[in-house]
Amino acid sequence: MSEFTIVQNKEDLIDAIKSKLSEGYKESEMTVISKTKLHIDALHDSEVNLTATSGSFSDKMAKILTGEDGEEAVLAHYKLPEEELERYKKEILNDNYLVVATKDTTSHVEADKANVAFETNQTKSNSHYSEETNGPKS
């Protein structure tokens, strides 16, 4: 289940993200949805996903030709009831921001165990290498 927070300006946006971090969410579990592309230095090197509903020039042209609604296309990912979808769509069109926090409940342990790129081998006593590996981690 995703938690949606509506904010009206960039300062409140940073505060909302900090609040979600203090609630235990990771940066990678948060998305900021806006009408236009965001340029916020504080989020430049973060893992927070910044999604603009306007898209690129080619996206805009495709929307004109197909009649697709950019806000609805982005919000469809969250499988919201129609009334919530319309409410959040209206907020985006009014130049507000949505901070969406979704807990990642998947387990990544299996991938860590099966990743041969980070598998290490025992060194041979006659070897001049400090460690032999089967991948980029050396």
From Swiss-Prot:
Polar residues composition-biased segments: 118-138
Pfam families xrefs: YflT (PF11181)
Record-linked InterPro entries: GSP17M-like_dom
Region annotation Disordered: where it falls in the sequence: 115-138
Family: Belongs to the UPF0355 family.
The protein's name: UPF0355 protein SSP2326
